Amino acid sequence: MLWSSLIALVLVARNAEAIHTLRFACSQLVTERLDPLVNPGKNPSPHMHQIVGGNAFNTTMDPSNDIGETATCTTCTFSEDFSNYWTAVLYFRARNGTFKRVPQIANQNLAQAEGGMTVYYISPDNTTSPITAFRPGFRMLAGTAENRKPESGFVNLYRCYDSYDENMFFKPNPMGIAATDTTELPKSFCGGGIRVNTFFPTCWNGVDLDTPDHKSHVAYPDRGAPCPATHPVEIPQVFIETIWDTEKFDKSLWPEDGSQPFVFSQGDPTGYGHHADYVFGWKGDGLQKAMDARCDVYDASPEPLIFPPEGCPHLKTQSQKVANQCSQRQVAVEPLDEWLDALPGNMPITYS
């Protein structure tokens, strides 16, 4: 994602302030049907997820346990980030009715990552506005799995790439929000993949680490306004970026009527129901120090998508090769890369 595009998107949520950004890769940890936030203790959960981050991810993830202290490795570049981030999984539905998982590909200037996602933490330029880092036990949910229609504002934004080169420079990738960006899955063939950005809320009520719906304790500011009185504490803007490798699925496999063939694992063929989960797991006060220092990709490098370690001396990093070695075996064991007669869990496809 181009730096200027990032600014254009996030200023909407940051009241038109300049911003500072951490951008880093998190390789794949595991892909399986577990969801300790929405379906704690249920093995398997109803639909498939792809998970990145620390290896403390499990079926329950008791909020009283600090996963920043219990995890022993992380798939993320910042070695103190043992948080877990996960989303639904994209599947291709062929004209014969069978399904195949769409793999993820690495992002621009993060080509050594094995699948996974790119994670962003954003803070405003105004250092007099305190940004409160999350606390152990904090978790939240962005998006609604059951959505099949557009809503006011957006949680997800899609971009259709035509191609990419050996350096993972994707095309087209215009500055700002492109006229072709959508809040639903693209309807045309995307030879360079489908990128989806998912944005988490930036305001917290300052009390609850979670709520039964995993949403009520946090809020999005209204059209760039300050945080509302009900949720007065400003927290980092977290958003995650996933690129699905749709190039692998030639148009000869598409439905004969040419209709959009991709569907998310909860049975969503629209993209409006894409959603993401976040469980905080940074070790110690590293994230708070980074937010206080307004660590920034752009300030640290002439190339804004490369983040050298000296860009945030408050945080420890690890090589992507080391990060790629962190993984988990499936707890809910089932095939991942075979052609399937139905979505995992026999999830029905719904349009409303």
Task: Provide a role label for each language-model segment.
Residues 19-45, 50-198, 205-352:
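Primary mode marks residue(s) on the alpha4-beta5-alpha5 output face of response regulator receiver
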Residues 1-21, 352:
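Fungal secretory targeting signals
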